């Protein structure tokens, strides 16, 4: 599987297919989202919210929870707010988690 991924990435870079995904590190909609890492949400969540690449900082973990007030999720949200201009935070769960 690793060889397939590396080959795809090589072709992706050589063809400059990445250019259509270019975005600022600052989220266009000043939005951060904490959600579950469930694979069913990979494309579904942004599509359901009308988000494009660069619109939001999306933080994912098992269950979409803040388990530790000093952990990596809180650190990511603090950086999003204080460094990257985020003004809105959504915590989005889902059924059948």
Model-derived features: positions:
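Short HxH-centered metal-ligating active-site micro-motif
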Residues: 53-97
